[in-house]
Amino acid sequence: MSDLQAAEGPGSWSPTARPGSAGGVGDCQGVEGSQAAASENEDLENKDTSLLASATDPEPCSSPHRPQMVSPVSKDATEDLRKATGPLEAQALVKQDLLPADQAQVLNEMAKYQVPQRSGDIVMIQSEHTGAIDVLSADLESADLLGDHRKVSPPLMAPPCIWTFAKVKEFKSKLGKEKNSRLVVKRGEVVTIRVPTHPEGKRVCWEFATDDYDIGFGVYFDWTPVTSTDITVQVSDSSDDEDEEEEEEEEIEEPVPAGDVERGSRSSLRGRYGEVMPVYRRDSHRDVQAGSHDYPGEGIYLLKFDNSYSLLRNKTLYFHIYYTS
């Protein structure tokens, strides 16, 4: 044993002397070296792949299990984009490299169309031909797009005072002798007597009677400036009244823009008229129908005698209309 150890010596080691042990140690060192080299190659490949992915896909796919990272520069740019309302601020953001040039151009265009802050949504309409942009408010009341066509309710009317008296023959004989106190309302017709308010009066009064048959009667008030105190009589067919009502409804439903000069500045007809007394059939052939109403203001009273429901008979009407102070 000593000769063998001496023969081998520390400086004369040979891999063939102990093939099993020497070969085992050598194999282990070779495997570890090859694994280290392979891992280094994989690291280099992973680095190249990550660099290539970052160059070709700058925005990584979002994952529901991974929090999103927001760049502070992009966030500040978004806040500055919201706050920037003028061209000077947009130019300042461009100099600070916080806002792209194309976004600055958009802000410059938007700064030309500033509107006052109002309640409601803002609607921007761009013309297809000229490219001009109109800024409108969705709040029609504040934008005044309806002009004079707002549906304003008329003031409430005080109820009239009405009464009857039985001296029909005396009343008709007296008025039959006076001029412009007797007329015939033909079948299917509506007669409207227009009575303006008088500057020296405070109330309007009416009295009327008919021969043999009743007639419909109602009182309305037209809120319109008075240019003449003359009493006028207007005769219309029932179909004409229906056509006029349909036209009035169409005019109300189709508001006219305030800037349209050709269409004029018509007011809402429904808000112009007040109802003092609705049209009902009155037994004017039995008793004299009388009444009065205090002036609500300046305007014209419309006394309607309605015979549109009668298809066969004409009605002879005796009436007396006056004012008192």
Curated annotation (Swiss-Prot):
GOLD domain span = 159-323
Q: Any coiled-coil ranges, and where?
A: none
Q: Sorted alphabetically, which InterPro entries does this protein's record hold?
A: GOLD_dom, GOLD_dom_sf, Golgi-PI4KB_interaction
Bias class Acidic residues marks the residues at: 238-254
Q: Organism source for this protein?
A: Homo sapiens (Human)
* Pfam families (alphabetical): GOLD_2
PROSITE patterns from the entry?
GOLD
For region Disordered, the annotated ranges are 1-78, 232-267
Residue positions where N6-acetyllysine is found in the record: 169
> Any idea what this protein is called?
Protein TMED8
Sorted keywords for this record are: Acetylation
Q: Which domain of life is it from?
A: Eukaryota
